[in-house]
Structure formats: C-alpha cells, structure tokens
Regions:
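Phosphate/pyrophosphate- and phosphate-bearing ligand-binding catalytic cores of soluble enzymes
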Residues: 1-118, 123-127, 143, 147-156
Length: 156
C-alpha cells in the first residue's frame, strides 16, 4: 500500500465504455480493479465451471519493423502503440491466426470464444496442458517469428 498518487490507465476501450455506462466520473483504484474483473468475467469462462487460468500468455511487445512485416501480410492486425518503436499485439489474435481458437486435443484445448484461454476439460494433466501450450508457442513462432511468453506460473 502507498499514499502516493497514482495515474490510472483507463484508455482500454471496454474499460472506458464501462466507466461511462456506470457513470463513474473519477474512478478509484478499487473501481478500476472491480471493473476489470467484471470485464474479464464477461469475456472469459468461469474457472469453477470450465477449468482454466484465464489468460495463459502475455501479449507480446514487438518492434515497429516486425509489425510492418506482419501487417504487410495481415492487413487487419490489431495492435496498441506503446512508443514510436514498440507495439503490443494481442496474443489471442496470433493464436487464432494459427488455427488454434477452439481447438481441443485430448482433455485440453483453447476456449471456443477466446484463444488465449487454455481449458481443462476435466481430466487433463499438468503435462498435457503444458505440452499443448508449447504447441501453441511453436505455431506462433513459426508463423509470426514471435515467441509467446507465459503469463501463468509453470510449476514442475
């Protein structure tokens, strides 16, 4: 905890829209936290119903040069400008473009509505989930030359 002033980043479109809908003119840190949870809950499966840990991979940050190379092939690539030379690309978009959205293999797969969510269909082992995640990483690396980084903690 700190008493310092914080700058709250509220430029994420769904967050801005929800702040407006709920008429919160000066959102607090707690407001933002609650709204982000609400947004995620509306987009992602409930782990109590379908085993998952929400976003499995981080959104990669790439160079302007790499973005230009990818966008020459994929005109509608979504991205967020971080600086003149750094851009963030949604990992879910990369995974979907590799044909892995909604893909099921054995007892694991990606969620049908969000490619970034790896699901456990009831009986998948940690090894099966890990191997599936590595398959996704290899496909994205091969197609886009981007190495995805896990957002989850991998425990041996």
């Amino acid at each position: 905890m700190t008493k310092k002033s914080h700058f709250l980043k509220t430029n994420y479109k769904p967050l801005k829209e929800l702040i407006k809908i709920k008429n919160i003119p000066n959102p607090t840190i707690q407001d933002i936290s609650n709204l982000v949870k609400e947004i995620r809950s509306s987009k992602l499966p409930d782990p109590k119903i379908i085993g998952n840990c929400w976003s499995f991979f981080k959104n990669p940050i790439i160079s302007k040069n790499k973005l230009e190379k990818i966008s020459s092939i994929h005109k509608l690539i979504p991205f967020y400008k971080l600086s003149d030379e750094k851009y963030k690309i949604p990992a879910a978009w990369l995974i979907e473009k590799c044909g892995m959205k909604g893909r099921i293999e054995g007892q694991t797969g990606t969620h049908k509505e969000h490619a970034l969510v790896i699901i456990n269909l009831c009986a998948a082992t940690g090894t099966e989930i890990y191997n599936f995640s590595q398959k996704i990483k290899k496909l994205v690396l091969k197609k886009f030359n981007i190495l995805l980084e896990e957002e989850v903690n991998i425990i041996d």
